[in-house]
Amino acid sequence: ALGGDMSTIATNPAGIGIYRSNDVTASFGFSSTGTESTYGGNTFNSNKNRWQLNNAGFVLSNKIGNETTLRYVNFGFSYNRSKSFNKTTSMEGLLNLTPDGQVVSQTFLMASQAGGMLENGYDIKYIDDNATPNNNVFNNNNVGWLAALGWGGSLYDPLYEDVNNKDRLTGFGAFLPQPYSKFRSRETGGVDQYDFNISFNFNDRVYLGVTVGAYDLNYTKSSIYSEDYDTGEYYDLNSWTKIDGTGFDFKLGAIIRPFETSPLRIGLAIHTPTFYKLTLATNVFLESGIYGQNDKGETEFYKTTVDSYDFLDNKDMTYDYELRTPWKYNLSLGY
């Protein structure tokens, strides 16, 4: 409710109406973020230091008159880095056994996702029948990506004949010793906010303002997960996801000084939802190396790759969607 501060452009737009002179402001920030992960007796640290422009803005104050009802018309602009997604995570170690002594492996999740398809009436062969570039298994709502990757990399048991016997579909990790697992993840991006304001001063007692907000959102995550076994068998799963888009909102504000002889101020602001239009793009790549039998019954080492690009015309899988945030209301008092 006090107003007269650049930050009010994004909270109560009427606060810019209290300015009686021009103003320019900018601030820089230094961030130091760190992540520590501990697993299986191994500790991993990731640190990142970064300088950045946190916010900048200006106000142009236009005096109308001393005796007129409308005293000032002010214009403002502000840039603010409202959200940062920067984060790096690393961890690795020997995966634990379950309380009953069973091996833990992500291949079980692949098998479970495929098993869910069976519960919905789809035969496991459905993946194989659709796993061609023309049929595009990665653009099929009936097939989970982990199920498709695991099938292509031979990472779960394909022998499934009895629909009532769910135990026959399981990850190949069940037949091997504990795997040594590694996970690396890097996230970047943020939300840049641009606010454009016009505000009015009436009789130095009533202040009204409107702010139009524009948002630029970008987020990128790349990760790799791997399991290595003492037998020499392994698999590496790489994934990449990017979300970007724009949004807008409106903010309406009022500040009232009810008593001419008192500095008491009452502030009220309403923020509409922020309306985002976003695009998600993603791709995955899996490489596996396992032992299997050839047509002659001999044991061979098979190296297999599964790339979503091969099924999507060398493109990312993309999905457009809209997001709307809630309404916001702000009531404040200042003295």
Positions of the model-derived regions?
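A generic local structural motif
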Residues: T11-N12, L252
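Outer-membrane beta-barrel porins/channels
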Residues: S61-Y335
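Outer-membrane beta-barrel translocator/receptor signature
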Residues: G3-T11, G17-L95, G189-D192
